[in-house]
Swiss-Prot record:
Name of the protein this chain belongs to: 1-deoxy-D-xylulose 5-phosphate reductoisomerase
Residues annotated for Mn(2+) binding in this entry: D147, E149, E218
Required cofactor(s): Mg(2+); Mn(2+)
SUPFAM superfamilies in UniProt: 1-deoxy-D-xylulose-5-phosphate reductoisomerase, C-terminal domain, Glyceraldehyde-3-phosphate dehydrogenase-like, C-terminal domain, NAD(P)-binding Rossmann-fold domains
Catalytic activity from the UniProt record: 2-C-methyl-D-erythritol 4-phosphate + NADP(+) = 1-deoxy-D-xylulose 5-phosphate + NADPH + H(+)
Binding site for 1-deoxy-D-xylulose 5-phosphate: K122, S148, E149, S173, H196, S209, N214, K215, E218
Keywords for the protein's UniProt record, in alphabetical order: Isoprene biosynthesis, Manganese, Metal-binding, NADP, Oxidoreductase
Protein family (similarity comment): Belongs to the DXR family.
Role played: Catalyzes the NADPH-dependent rearrangement and reduction of 1-deoxy-D-xylulose-5-phosphate (DXP) to 2-C-methyl-D-erythritol 4-phosphate (MEP).
Amino acid sequence: MKQISLLGSTGSIGTQTLDVIRDYPDQFTLSALACGTNLELCRNQIKEFQPKLVSVQRPEDAQTLAGEFGDSIEFLYGEEGLKEVARYSESDIVVTAITGSIGLLPTLSAIKAKKAVAIANKETLVSAGHLVVSAAKENDVPLIPVDSEHSAIFQALNGEPKKAVDRLILTASGGSFRDKSRAELDGVTVEQALAHPNWSMGAKVTIDSATMMNKGLEVIEAKWLFGLDYDQIDVLIHKESIIHSMVEYVDRSVIAQLGTPDMRVPIQYALTYPERFARPKHERLDLAELGKLHFEKMDMERFRCMKLAYEAGRAGGTMTTVLNAANEVAVCRFLQGEITFLEIERIIEEALSAHSPIAHPSLEEIQAVDASIRKQLQA
């Protein structure tokens, strides 16, 4: 029986992780969970899965839940609560399904407690990848990717040495506006941006998909997870989201991982690795019915956030911290109706242009830069 700590239980990845746990009650137990402010859903999850430790965002919510459930469950809150869930002694693996750089400290806490980490929180690797990877190596902790693209690469690599790999090819659906010209993007609405053609995701990642920043963040994530240079990581538009990513080897063999677009598949693989469990209810891929798969080159001028991500990644240091923080603030402001869709990339570009990067930042320096950028852009 594998004990699981889940960070971000009420979000898209979190609820789909619970679907997997629900499907395999003899294999998985939810020992601890952390969520934000969705108290109603959290309450239902506690009743169903009966974790021993729960953390919420606000102290008053922790007090409310403690009054309802009594002493059989420990309730915590805030940043310390997140870290406690991440390093909970009874857990074997931690799923970091929380969105944003708030996931950094609990991820490091899980690693230092020598917990296996199923990482779905790409912002942590973007803002502080060198610290996370270094800590994982130091503590001999596996970082198992949950994102469909990185799970695909993880499977396609299958233990091959790095010297055998020529390049990684991440696929991208193109997002909500893949068929619109750049001129047509000027007046798009929040509702239009949230209508993703293939995947069911949270609001932030859906907007990131529309700007193509999500794929940019995934390029940086891939660099840290697999230890390759940016020149070895390419992106290809693939509208059907059937090929989740590919690895091209030095002998020009290309190995791809295919499947219908359902996040529960890579989530399950991260939880069961190195084993595979059957999913009899899952839709089987029928290539004959699909008939054709389509691919397009990535247009860096149309999708400028992708270009910014590569530039920040190559610059290194705190440039990716700025990229991530500026993007989080800009997306939040767009969702609140404060800025237009195309202003997201402008805000990010201006923040990057104004920043003097620190080459090898400490955790404290990353936190300071992150806080400074957020304060500037929220003003």
